[in-house]
Amino acid sequence: MLITGLIIGCLLIGLVIGYVVRQHQHRQELLAVQKQARDIIASATAETQQKIAKLTADSRRETLTYQQSVKDELAEQTSDIAVREQRRQQREQLLGQMGVRLADQTAILDERSQANRDQRQKIRDLKAQALQLRTDRDEMLAQQAGIDEQAAKDHVLADTELDLKRDRDVEIKALNDNAVANAERWAKDVVLSATESGPQDLPKEHLEHTVTVPNGEIRSKIIGRDGQHIRLLETLTGTDLIFVPDDNTTLFISTHDPIRREVARVALTNLVASRRISSNQIETQVENAQRDVNHSLWETGEQTVSGLHVGWMHPDLMKLIGRLKYRTSYGQNVLLHSIEVAQLTGAMAARLGYNTRLARRAGLLHDLGKAIDHEVEGTHVEIGTEFAQKYGEDDVVINAIAAHHGDVEKTSPLAELVAAADAISGARPGARSESVEDYINRLRALEKIANDQSGVAESYAIQAGRELRIIVKPQELDDTAAANLTQEVAQQIESTLTYPGKIKVTTIRKSTAVEYVGDEKKKKSKKKKKKAANA
């Protein structure tokens, strides 16, 4: 019991002591906090006073600066106002001077206006007097001539019209005579100038009809077992593939379609290069070749159109132009021929003052029908005209295509230029070529037409078939008949033969008389002298 009391007493004492200690600590902490608060307040007060002092100084400085700027601005405005006032005074002075001048000019104008009114009145009076004099003259002339005024006017007008018509006819005749006299010279100058500066020399491309096979192994692969591969190639390309009999390394591609020939050539070249030849490879290479050739057709057409600067053209027409690259006529590449015709036509049009772009366009498209004349029925002129109309070409271009061989009438000067450029391009030396057999047959056909005519002694085709000379029998044909013979032969050549350029037909009629004088008489004279001497 005592122990319990001691424990409780100890606890109470401990609580009292803890309370006292806690109160003391709390008082110490409170004092520390109060001291810290006083320090913070003092520091804040000092900082605030510093800021107030700084702000006051800044404000005073800004105020002074603002006052100075206001003073400067006021001074500037005062100066500006003074300058404006000076200008105003000068303007007022100038306006005063202008007012004086205006008053002077107004007075002068009033005087001139009055003078003009007086002059106009005088002119009206003079016109009235002239009209009265004219009326009196007409009445006097009518009385003297015995005709009225209207009849006299009609007579004068008729005489004047007759004189003007006569002068006009004389002037027109002089112009026509001058044009006729100089037309050939002018035309030669235009053509010569165009041929010198117009067409560019383009390399003559050779179209390959063969593919070289490097060895017998590749040859066997191309033929295939029982000819399977070569028959597949012929079926897919639409061509006939023939190995040259005496040269097993040369494969000849036979077809009338130049595009198919090119597809077959490209496919075979790729197969030979890859050395992998099977049915699948053949089909793949033929498809690739068709795609590449079709793309090259469009690309060639686009480059040609762009290079000649003929403007926008339908893609189908550009593809047809590309097809001309693989078409030849008398050995001349039709695309190069068309480019040359376009350049010549444009050059001549420039010298004559016509539309050069339209001229080059007509020249480029004039042989368009040759691109597909082996696929579509009709002449290349008809086909080209139809496609030009289909794709909305200009009427001048359509007429130039239709008329460049004389099938229809030429309705524009550009059509004449296209026909002339076509003839120049085809007739120039080296432009066209033909096989030896065709060349000899053409010469023989020319000579046969001449030799079949009555009165012809002999004939010769010279200048590579560009001239035919006919020698006639003078005792059978006179000069008139010889001229008629020349015309008849020219007409037969034009109607029966196909020839590049133009052919000159010359008929020669020559009569020679020979008589010998002197030898027989001298012999007889010598015999008489000998007889006299012997006697």
From Swiss-Prot:
The chain crosses the membrane at residues 1-21. One of its GO terms (biological process) is mRNA catabolic process. It is a single-pass membrane protein. It holds the Pfam family HD. Keywords: Cell membrane, Endonuclease, Hydrolase, Membrane, Nuclease, RNA-binding, Transmembrane, Transmembrane helix. GO terms for molecular function: RNA binding; RNA endonuclease activity. Residues 334-427 form the HD domain. The keyword Cytoplasm does not apply. PROSITE patterns: HD (PS51831). Its EC number is 3.1.-.-. Coiled coil: none annotated. Residues 207-268 form the KH domain. InterPro entries: Diverse_Catalytic_Enzymes (IPR051094), HD/PDEase_dom (IPR003607), HD_domain (IPR006674), HDIG_dom (IPR006675), KH_dom (IPR004087), KH_dom_type_1 (IPR004088), KH_dom_type_1_sf (IPR036612), Ribonuclease_Y (IPR017705). Belongs to the RNase Y family. HAMAP family: RNase_Y (MF_00335). This is Ribonuclease Y 2. It comes from Levilactobacillus brevis (strain ATCC 367 / BCRC 12310 / CIP 105137 / JCM 1170 / LMG 11437 / NCIMB 947 / NCTC 947) (Lactobacillus brevis). The lineage of its organism: Bacteria, Bacillati, Bacillota, Bacilli, Lactobacillales. The gene is rny2.
